């Protein structure tokens, strides 16, 4: 039989008492009163902050949005199917934040910056708040460098600068996403980081965009943030801010970034859903009163930083879908008033085979020629004027039977100019190729050709110029000016190519 020694027992008790650590941990907790439709009402959580993350006992995370006198309204970041009435909730003391690092390049992530492309975890040591304040006036400088989209119609007449916010607006199926993805493809070799945010899109559409980027080697400098149509409203609402936080990480590291939001009207719908379920009073079109602030605080984060902060930039291209061309609806007018110009895509032009279907008459860039290189300014001024005159003449010519020779010539020139603005999808042009194309059209070198021959001739001319007159490209890329020497080289190339082309066509 084991003998019990009193001194041994007292030693053990003494040791345990010495090891005891008096640590008081205060946890701010609450109880679920009601849950459903992605919303939970919590009693308690007395010291919770607006926008603070809260954690339910079964693991779901939510954001405290409504702080009322007797309860807290929380939006859930998951389905919350296991949350029950009476289960406990604890405040985390953290505002929503995401990890950020260079390792995100080439990846597809969700609104919480978690990878969804099946390629493993992303390593990151730094965190950024999803909602961070926009740079102030002193932190910015005016936009002066061009962000080339590779589309002649935009780069010549509606130029976009680094740090600008340009809205892409139009009906469904008019090529809005195509304009945005072409802009990303054209950033290859330009040292611009691109972020594509898909909000409430079909999974198949996002997969198609990602495949295009992968095939064209654009994923190397691109991050895709995607929340599909079946995602909870909270995550669709957060996705654009997550994209902005990722872009800001690079902007504050003296890099140039471009971010595409596709599309903020879906974010507004998700926010409307959350607000109505939280019983916030509805306003126009049942949107809550602060839906303007929802988009303004997002788009104001795009900026061209001052030289003191390293001159990084973030260019925002929000895409908004209109219903049968109605630009005066609530969300389109809000976003138009926040952005520095808009590119309007028309369903009529799209159906008439003019693609990209940009309506040059009502599209505008409020930065203007400050965002163009000198060479482009030299050739593009004439183009906009001639196209505007052509549009006016064309409307008038429908009613006139006999037109004088000068008017007929002007109409013929206008038709050829419209033809040179047409481009295939995923075929962006370099700025040198654009200058060559515009010069050829505005100086009447296409007037000899039939309209159907214009595109074929221009494709062959680009190839001919690249192989036989490489100095032209060198002059423009080094001096950024359309010099007399460059003009002479271009005239020679056009003349030689025209002779070759006419001989080919006759043969």
Curated annotation (Swiss-Prot):
<dbReference type="InterPro" id="IPR033732">
    <property type="entry name" value="ATP_synth_F1_a_nt-bd_dom"/>
</dbReference>
<dbReference type="GO" id="GO:0046933">
    <property type="term" value="F:proton-transporting ATP synthase activity, rotational mechanism"/>
</dbReference>
<keyword id="KW-0934">Plastid</keyword>
<protein>
    <recommendedName>
        <fullName>ATP synthase subunit alpha, chloroplastic</fullName>
        <ecNumber>7.1.2.2</ecNumber>
    </recommendedName>
</protein>
<dbReference type="GO" id="GO:0009535">
    <property type="term" value="C:chloroplast thylakoid membrane"/>
</dbReference>
<keyword id="KW-0813">Transport</keyword>
<keyword id="KW-0067">ATP-binding</keyword>
<dbReference type="InterPro" id="IPR038376">
    <property type="entry name" value="ATP_synth_asu_C_sf"/>
</dbReference>
<dbReference type="Pfam" id="PF00006">
    <property type="entry name" value="ATP-synt_ab"/>
</dbReference>
<dbReference type="GO" id="GO:0043531">
    <property type="term" value="F:ADP binding"/>
</dbReference>
<dbReference type="InterPro" id="IPR005294">
    <property type="entry name" value="ATP_synth_F1_asu"/>
</dbReference>
<keyword id="KW-0150">Chloroplast</keyword>
<keyword id="KW-0472">Membrane</keyword>
<dbReference type="GO" id="GO:0005524">
    <property type="term" value="F:ATP binding"/>
</dbReference>
<feature type="site" description="Required for activity">
    <location>
        <position position="363"/>
    </location>
</feature>
<keyword id="KW-0375">Hydrogen ion transport</keyword>
<dbReference type="InterPro" id="IPR000194">
    <property type="entry name" value="ATPase_F1/V1/A1_a/bsu_nucl-bd"/>
</dbReference>
<feature type="binding site">
    <location>
        <begin position="170"/>
        <end position="177"/>
    </location>
    <ligand>
        <name>ATP</name>
    </ligand>
</feature>
<dbReference type="InterPro" id="IPR036121">
    <property type="entry name" value="ATPase_F1/V1/A1_a/bsu_N_sf"/>
</dbReference>
<dbReference type="Pfam" id="PF02874">
    <property type="entry name" value="ATP-synt_ab_N"/>
</dbReference>
<dbReference type="InterPro" id="IPR020003">
    <property type="entry name" value="ATPase_a/bsu_AS"/>
</dbReference>
<keyword id="KW-0406">Ion transport</keyword>
<keyword id="KW-0066">ATP synthesis</keyword>
<dbReference type="InterPro" id="IPR023366">
    <property type="entry name" value="ATP_synth_asu-like_sf"/>
</dbReference>
<dbReference type="InterPro" id="IPR000793">
    <property type="entry name" value="ATP_synth_asu_C"/>
</dbReference>
<comment type="function">
    <text>Produces ATP from ADP in the presence of a proton gradient across the membrane. The alpha chain is a regulatory subunit.</text>
</comment>
<keyword id="KW-1278">Translocase</keyword>
<dbReference type="Pfam" id="PF00306">
    <property type="entry name" value="ATP-synt_ab_C"/>
</dbReference>
<keyword id="KW-0547">Nucleotide-binding</keyword>
<dbReference type="GO" id="GO:0045259">
    <property type="term" value="C:proton-transporting ATP synthase complex"/>
</dbReference>
<dbReference type="InterPro" id="IPR004100">
    <property type="entry name" value="ATPase_F1/V1/A1_a/bsu_N"/>
</dbReference>
<dbReference type="InterPro" id="IPR027417">
    <property type="entry name" value="P-loop_NTPase"/>
</dbReference>
<keyword id="KW-0793">Thylakoid</keyword>
<keyword id="KW-0139">CF(1)</keyword>
<comment type="similarity">
    <text>Belongs to the ATPase alpha/beta chains family.</text>
</comment>
<comment type="subunit">
    <text>F-type ATPases have 2 components, CF(1) - the catalytic core - and CF(0) - the membrane proton channel. CF(1) has five subunits: alpha(3), beta(3), gamma(1), delta(1), epsilon(1). CF(0) has four main subunits: a, b, b' and c.</text>
</comment>
